[in-house]
Amino acid sequence: TALKLSEKLDRYGIKIIGTTYKSLDLAEDRGSFSTLLKENKIPYPEFGVAETPDEALVIADKLDFPILIRPSYVLGGQGMKIVINKKELEDHVKDLLEKIPNNKLLLDHYLDGAIEAEADAICDGKNVLIIGIMEHIEPCGVHSGDSNATLPPFNLGKLVMQQIIDHTNKIALSLNTVGLINIQFAIKDEVVYII
């Protein structure tokens, strides 16, 4: 992945053109990224990070079902699943930890009935240009690479569109983005969450 490659280059002191490894890693690290979102007053679903089935069960008690589970630091929606009870959660967590050992698992409260959207933007570190905002056709939770979307969005009101624009600008600038950025959103009850 780009993150792994940039980490190696950073370790050897090789500068890259574009967003720094530190910013890429911050965007991928759920704990650090949620701090950035809090500082910018940007909503996101409640979440937890687990390394064992027991930890996942403790987190599930705090989040309430349904819960979206996925491995940390993987691409393509690998291992992502929405679970609706403790038995499903425990089975999926055990399966993931066998398939991808030594990986942390992300557990998000799943915003049932939410609409998914995403924004693509380009930033020079000071200015953000939103290239496009897409609205997904499938329910929120289907991996974006496996779903269809419309450009421009067909059913997002002015309030929602403004939140997407504001969130995209704040995140791109807070991460010191230099280059492209893609941000995914879940919209429920006119509130735009980062997912």
Regions inferred by a protein language model and the residue ranges of each:
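N-terminal beta-alpha lobe that positions the nucleotide/phosphoryl donor
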Residues: 1-183, 187-195
